[in-house]
């Protein structure tokens, strides 16, 4: 529903919008996507890599499968999306890639190691790609955004450890976990 709502909102800006629901960790599916978009719109000017999953567990509790699943979406999904679309974007006179990191790509808290590694990785990947595009004098501009808490369904579909049971809307509980700078 939120994907459809977002597409509807963007119609007010007179831009062509495609919405595609795919598993971003599926490299083959991601690399097939640019041609579908080009067939629909004729070209691609902007890619917004925005996928995430929540895992709430300690490093010791997490399994290889947890790491593969989490980083497959959080980090490799962004890498796949970027690599799939980049050759097409470089053909445009102006183009942009926007990758969603997180405030947790800037700081860390307990029981979120997989999420943090993924989001720190997105930040590093994006900064590196931005420098490479400048080095090439490419028309592609590259950005990462680092939002804080946003009311999405990410927590509803994540893997959680019940030991971290705080109300993220409660300023005192957040401050106790993150420290006084979180207020």
Residue ranges and their predicted role:
Residues 60, 107-114:
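Active-site loop immediately N-terminal to the catalytic Tyr-X3-Lys motif
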Residues 82, 118:
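Active-site helix of classical SDR
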Residues 58-59, 63-69:
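Substrate-binding pocket helix/loop in short-chain dehydrogenase/reductase
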Residues 21-32, 64:
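The beta1-alpha1 cofactor-binding region of Rossmann-like NAD(H)/NADP(H)-dependent oxidoreductases
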Residues 135-183:
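SDR active-site lid
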Residues 13-16, 36-47, 55:
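A glycine-rich helix->loop->beta "capping" turn
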Residues 102:
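Residue(s) in the substrate-gating loop at a strand-loop-helix junction
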């Amino acid at each position: 529903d939120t994907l459809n709502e977002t597409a509807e909102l963007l119609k007010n800006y007179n831009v062509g919008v495609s919405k595609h629901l795919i598993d971003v960790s599926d490299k083959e599916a991601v690399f097939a996507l640019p041609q579908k978009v080009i067939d629909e719109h004729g070209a691609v000017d902007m890619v917004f890599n925005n996928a995430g999953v929540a895992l709430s567990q300690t490093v010791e509790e997490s399994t290889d499968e947890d790491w593969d699943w989490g980083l497959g979406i959080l980090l490799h999904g962004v890498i796949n999306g970027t690599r799939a679309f980049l050759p097409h974007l470089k053909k445009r006179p102006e183009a942009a890639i926007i990758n969603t990191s997180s405030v947790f790509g800037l700081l860390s808290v307990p029981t979120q190691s997989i999420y943090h590694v993924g989001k720190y990785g997105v930040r590093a990947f994006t900064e590196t790609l931005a420098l490479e595009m400048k080095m090439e004098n490419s028309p592609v501009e590259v950005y990462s955004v680092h939002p804080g808490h946003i009311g999405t369904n990410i927590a509803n579909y994540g893997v959680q450890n019940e030991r971290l049971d705080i109300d993220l809307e409660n300023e005192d509980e957040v401050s106790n976990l993150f420290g006084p700078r979180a207020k």
